[in-house]
Structures are given as structure tokens and as C-alpha cells.
């Protein structure tokens, strides 16, 4: 039996879609030196090759891809967006604006100088900035009629040009950004590793790699004469056992009665005490605790140690420094801090935002008490609130369909901006109401990644049919322009952040990468800095940059 694979793919669009996805994702796993091709590039290049071979797809049917992607981006940005925008994000907002406005200026200037059509120029800008939201906003402006173009053939030609420009410039944008991240600190005689260590020393930050990856343990000891001499009539607060060792006393048994001590309690000879702490903390205890006096008793040791993810929600906590939580008073241990899916360094001076996730371990009742003070414990359910997801998706589409008329000029946000606003709102409400709009992070990641990959298939198939012909005519101009759009905004943002805002170089580079929304480059920066300190800057600009880039893509098309 002979199977004509090409004919089968031409006849079955769904089969073609998933074949391109499977081949592209496999290609994305290939590594060159230390750099992985990545899913986006793998799928895009594969789709271009299939498009060049004559395979086509109704790209309108793939619009659900960019809609899912931009809606999920909004949900992720929602918990931190308003905190960054209104409180501590002045530097990050300015850096994002420097990158975006300079990129727009260069794009428009080169469009005029080289005579490029606006579709090609906008796609070139999106690819050069490795910013898919720009492409999403631009394509939506064309499809929704916001561009003012009514001729379907011109709209299709412009969308094809978008795809060609993006496909030509994406790889150049990614490689040049990574190259800049390595080269610029050396040219400025700045070592990212040293800059990271400087922040760590100034703020007392513990690196993520040094955090505990196991739960605290419980051990019990009997108070003997040696320990009484060491205590010297001091109460537990004055002894400061937690400050010295990292252990705290959870229970005391005195005369057969179990009690939870407070800071005023004074230990007496014969008391049996249960201490909670990491193994290395127990090892730091004074020998008077341990030498032959350990107690093995079920009632004394019957404590439930848990690890929970606490979401910051309460207004009286948002805006405070991590050190102000005084976790030691609650007998809890902080394992990590996560913001916008980025694991942050253990910086006790970091300002907490609503939606931040604190992974905390300790005795169950203490962790629950801390969660009540800070916010709420993240739901462990794997079931998504699909009703809220669908309702806010509908709201986003409705917002995008609203147009305002000023005489003969009509203006609207478009589906991309509408879905982004709805997603941000859902994410913000989720951070404030634990049972509303819950979407497991794994499900959110899958929806976002699948949406992006489906969108990339549409872009690649659309561009592939005439990409190589276009490259033969305008390829060198596009590559030069792409390099300018990629490099110049980064250099300007670096100079602005370093000499005007006086930012630490590690934080500055993280913020610039966040303004470019380029996760692969962020991994390279962390590796180059031998630290996760740059993630502090990345999280600061990432959320707001996604919003600005989407709006920018729409505005560029409308203005032309």
C-alpha cells in the first residue's frame, strides 16, 4: 500500500498543523554549542520550509493561537502589573519605554529611508525585538479593520509581509541580544558576576542554589544541668536560639504537660523540648542540648511539618520588605520567592507585590497562621476554573470589538489589547481571591505555549511561500535594519540605566532582557552572572513590557 504523504497533508489541515508542530518542536531541542534552538525558532523555521514547499493553511483558523497566547500573557502579568506600574516600577517603566520608543523610531526611519512597506517593517521590528506581542497587536489591527485598510488583497499582502519580516529578523534579534549581553559588560569593564555579588553583599541575599530543598526535622532534648548553666535564667526571647542556630522551640513538656511556649518562657531542669529546624541547624546547637540528652517520645515529636506556597494578597503586606514579615516569630522557614514565574534570589530587602508566591515550610498550624496574615495558600487542585477563563475571554473579545468614532476616524483597541486587558484583570482578581479564576500553572503554560506555537505555524506557512524570493531582493537590507533595531535600543537602554538611573549592572541587564521579553537570553544572563540576581530586574520590566509591546504593534499599523 502506497501512502502519498504530501497529498495527505494537503488534504488534512489538522494533520498538517500537528506534523509541523511535532517536527518543529523536535528541531527546537537541537543544541549548537551551549545554545538550544528553542521551540519558537524550531516551529517557525519548520513552518517556513513547509510553506516554501507549497503547503498552505487557512491562517484565519489559527487566530485562536495568538488569542490564547496574549490572553495567557495577561493572566500571568496581572498579579504584578499594577504593583509595578503604580509603586516601585519607575525605573523599569522608563527602561521599557526607552527600548520600545527607540525601536519604533528606528523602524519608522528605516521604513521611510528604504521604502519598506509597513507590514514588512512591523514584522521586522517584532522579530528584531524577539517580541511576539508586537506581531500579535499588528496582525490584529489588520484583521479587525483598525488599520483603515479595506481591500482584502492588501490586508493579506500586509499580513504576509509581517510574517516575512518576523521570520527574517527573529534569529538575528535573539543572537544579537545574547551577544550584547556578553560583550557590553566587558567593554564597560563591568563583570556581571561581580555586580551580582555586590547586590548580594549589600542586601544579604542568599542564592537560589543555596536554598533548602528538604523539609525541617523535629528532634527532642531533655534540659540538664549543663543547659541550665548556659541558659543562666534568660527567657527564650533573650536566648535567641533561632537567631543563633536556625532552630526554634515548638513544644515544652513540663511535669507531663505539653505546652507551646512563648518568648517569656524560661526553661527549667527536667523540661523536655521539641526543636524544629534543618539538619544543619540542629548541628549548630550548643553541645549542652545534644550530649546524651535526646528524647524519643511520640507525643513530643508528633508535629506535622508541611510545605506550602503562600500567595501575597493582603494590602498591609504588599509593599513591605521581605524582612518585615519576621518569619522567625512565626516559626516558619522561607524556601523560595517566585514572581512572574521567575525564582527570585532570597533578598530580604525585596518589596513584596500582590501575587508573589512564598514557599514556606514549618509546623502546619504556624504556616496556616502565617498564610492568614500574608494572603492565602495556593490551591493545590489541578482543576481549572474554565467558566471564569471563558467568560473573561469573551469579555476581552467584546472590549476589542468596541470602536469610538471621531468624525470620519474610528479607533478601537482590537482583540489583542482587549484580551490582554481581560487577562490582566483575571490575573489580578485571582491574586486577590484564592478561589476565583484558578488556572493551574501547568495548564496556563500549556495554553500559552500551544497558542504561541500554533500562531508560529500560521506565520511560517504564510511567510514560506515567498520568503526566499523576498530575501533575495531585500535580505541584506532587512538584516542590517534588524541588527540596528535589535542593538541600538539595548545600547541606549544600557546607557540610560547605567548613567542616568545609576542602576546596578546585573539588575540593569535583567531589566533590559525583561523589556525584550526574551526568556532564552535571560537564561544566558543568569549563567554569565553565575547568579539569579538579574531575575530581580527581569521581573520588574517583563509584565509591563508585554502590555506596551502589544499596544505598540497595533499603533504602528494604525499610524500608517
From Swiss-Prot:
Protein keywords: Cell membrane, Membrane, Repeat, Transmembrane, Transmembrane helix, Transport
Subcellular location(s) of the protein: Cell membrane
Membrane-crossing segments per the record: 5-25, 37-57, 66-86, 91-111, 161-181, 386-406, 409-429, 452-472, 477-497, 506-526, 539-559
Domain RCK C-terminal as annotated: residue spans: 203-292, 293-377
Record's GO cellular component terms: plasma membrane
Disulfide bonds listed in the record: none
SUPFAM superfamilies: TrkA C-terminal domain-like
A GO term, aspect molecular function: monoatomic cation transmembrane transporter activity
InterPro entries xrefs: AAE_transporter, RCK_C, RCK_C_sf, Transp_YbjL_put, YidE_YbjL
Superkingdom of origin organism: Bacteria
Main location: membrane
Example GO biological process: potassium ion transport
Membrane topology: Multi-pass membrane protein
HAMAP family: YbjL
Family in the record: Belongs to the AAE transporter (TC 2.A.81) family. YbjL subfamily.
Protein name (Swiss-Prot/TrEMBL): Putative transport protein PBPRA2420
